[in-house]
């Protein structure tokens, strides 16, 4: 038995022991998907009846990293190589105006709440390469000679608190920590910020079930849009602890006021401006524990003031009967998202491709990083895809950009794609928080600047 198999056996045994101790003796049936990921993809996904379980199906890809010259597999006409290696759980990317790339190295801040589900979740996350001590810093990467490989790196900011989203507005760099939005003075070309940060506004903290907070500046620089995920799967701990969560907020930079922009979004992650319509788009990870086929994660154009269902309903007005008390008044107002890309695929990074230097077939759509499932059988995600757009809306079937993050038997993961960014040449950068690498995707005839 390999070392990874032993670790998985130990974790599985511990999970079983916790469940038995809590009185759950037949909790998870051998539940498997009954339809393909493709069936749960597109503007009108197939939504079968729920198959509820106390705990989700656990189907872990044990992390093994990349060895030697191993790398993800690019689509035909594309090439991939490592832009930077040896990072420490790189989660998010941000390009500065001079072409420097910021990398948020971050992990969950953890929780002091010791419920059975939380303890099980901690064991599972440890097996998929998450749940360790957070580096709590931002790394700067610089390619000085234009060969497509970062040859300079430095600790740009440290002593943060599970940082994630970043946005430069004028000469101020904003960073979304797990507990607050903070800002720092920025001078172009510097490789480290020594100045102390200033808190711009508090964000929901304490127990952080979904801890990542992302930000996106408005085109005029007056506003930051802030994502805040829910504190549970489906209000498991009551709605009181969900105050200010599962939504996108709008932060007015001049006044410091934070107000809700859209609600009912279980775990919104990346935000992006669609170039033709100017609409705000978001990637959202949906709920668990109602089967391998539900609920599809999605992207959608965000409507101001809209309610997207969580926790009372999903994908519009499909009622989640687990939530008590029910709120039929809110369900009646819930709107369906624009486009699904399969259950439990775990969307994170998105990047519109209008500034890409990849071949023309990849320049009118949206790149999406699917971090990959741990609770679906068979697994889903673990790839970077491209969704074609027409006139500002998804149009057509997604295409793979990068695959090969799983081993051939799908039992192990070389990596898991997370954040995306386009570098100054238009190449696609992909953060890989298991492989501890930032990958760079180009056309086969365009490997450098």
Swiss-Prot record:
Organism name: Gluconacetobacter liquefaciens
Molecular function GO labels: oxidoreductase activity
Annotated Gene Ontology cellular component terms: plasma membrane
Keywords noted in UniProt: Cell membrane, Membrane, Oxidoreductase, Transmembrane, Transmembrane helix
First-listed, main subcellular location of the protein, grouped into a coarse class: membrane
A Pfam cross-reference name: DUF7133
Compartments reported by the entry: Cell membrane
Transmembrane regions listed in the UniProt entry: 8-24
Topology versus the membrane: Single-pass membrane protein
Protein name: L-sorbosone dehydrogenase
EC number(s) on file: 1.1.1.-
Role played: Converts L-sorbosone into 2-keto-L-gulonic acid (2KGA).
